[in-house]
């Protein structure tokens, strides 16, 4: 009877995962229709729905298991046998690696994230050596120009599954050929071999053709974002062929792609050649398997800890009033813990901070908000924690700590990609770097605002600079929707002495924001003020923000480009 119960539990979990991934593929498969219909609000809703599917199905399985087991508590040996039986179901299972993560999620939900040990759940994969030796159908098709690059591109683009007409396909092909010839020599292109993914990658208002360009043994990305005009006709907006550009397109600050992937591991391996700087966790996350991305992030952390002797330290930069942030000196992630008590000027609650981080997870991040992974009961060996950090943890988050003697448990934290704090970057920047940083910062604010996100606290310390020089927002405790804010002009003073008073001469409600005030706390430095006024002076005008609000209320969804505007074919034509 017991063995049958263990078998039933294992099969119930795997069937639950099958149901979840089936719904995942179903929502993903609708991406083409939503794109063709230009139903951008449905695109946003589908993105949120797909994110929620995972936790929903974990909850369904947990309820089934409680019914099956009559909510009995089982010993360690029983749980180990369930995992062993589940492992035995996976050798021929096509999505075994994500099925392992689903098992982990069910276990954590049942046992409140306690006793997270390798004998009870898949801290490490049961099949680390397994690769997809046989794939039911190829992920990509091969194309060789044979001296006729334009003809080959015509064949590739006409063969797409999209059912809309092209605005001017021959024009776009000419642009693509021009971009390729500018990037590579004739000698390189003589051996050109293209591999084009069968499935389009959908995100925001674009459908991305993703491919590889093989030249004399070297491999380059070949990325074409397809948009449509106001008449519903298709056009290609640019052609990207560098690994740095591809890395930004698949960046950690962007929403997940909608791409139909029955075999996600195979797609991850295929993408790895054009995204060599991306970790396994980042690749899974980029294609929408963010929960397995979380598993892989933890495994990458464990691998780093195993091969390193570094101690955890307080992260460089200005200490936050809401979050305690720490890192390892050469690790590319940071760890963020919500403080038990906030600074007096912070009028937020712990619950509100959690809501803000969830909002960011579900919202279109437009390349300007860092994705996070959330962990509970995170265990760290005490000898790996610097004395300064340990004292800080004990002072700022004692309610979230559990001391196990040689280890500490942090009850809740976020893991996030590490960046250089913008304020520190600006302190070391030369004039051109400073100008570029201010341009990027202003663009980040504007793109977030256009996506209905107001950062709240706009100080430079709340933004980071990526290795590609992009500015990304990462402090979410005051974030809110643009439509919730009342942007006001400062009323003129009634009397000359009003301007000298310590208190404002006008009433201020909780949601009131006065953009004129941004100038005072952002532009105390003369050079910063000059660059800001030159490139982003409109951010100091309440009318600019109210205009954006009106566009949002009118239902307008802004275009989001994962590349510079000057790279757009339409801009090249103007130049």
Swiss-Prot record:
Q: What is its EC number?
A: 2.7.11.5, 3.1.3.-
| Location(s), subcellular | Cytoplasm
- GO MF, any single term: protein serine/threonine kinase activity
Q: Which reaction does it catalyse?
A: L-seryl-[isocitrate dehydrogenase] + ATP = O-phospho-L-seryl-[isocitrate dehydrogenase] + ADP + H(+)
Q: Which GO terms describe its biological process?
A: glucose metabolic process; glyoxylate cycle; tricarboxylic acid cycle
Record: residues binding ATP: 315-321, 336
For the keyword DNA-binding, the answer is no
Sorted keywords for this record are:
ATP-binding, Cytoplasm, Glyoxylate bypass, Hydrolase, Kinase, Nucleotide-binding, Protein phosphatase, Serine/threonine-protein kinase, Transferase, Tricarboxylic acid cycle
How is this protein annotated for GO cellular component?
A: cytoplasm
Q: Which InterPro entries match?
A: AceK_kinase (IPR046855), AceK_regulatory (IPR046854), Isocitrate_DH_AceK (IPR010452)
Q: List the catalytic residues.
A: 371
UniProt entry tagged with the keyword Nucleotide-binding? yes
Q: What does this protein do?
A: Bifunctional enzyme which can phosphorylate or dephosphorylate isocitrate dehydrogenase (IDH) on a specific serine residue. This is a regulatory mechanism which enables bacteria to bypass the Krebs cycle via the glyoxylate shunt in response to the source of carbon. When bacteria are grown on glucose, IDH is fully active and unphosphorylated, but when grown on acetate or ethanol, the activity of IDH declines drastically concomitant with its phosphorylation.
Protein family (similarity comment)? Belongs to the AceK family.
Spell out the PANTHER family in the cross-references.
ISOCITRATE DEHYDROGENASE KINASE_PHOSPHATASE, PTHR39559
Q: Please report the name of this protein according to its UniProt entry.
A: Isocitrate dehydrogenase kinase/phosphatase
User: What organism, scientifically named, is this protein from?
Assistant: Yersinia pestis
Q: What is the lineage of its organism?
A: Bacteria, Pseudomonadati, Pseudomonadota, Gammaproteobacteria, Enterobacterales
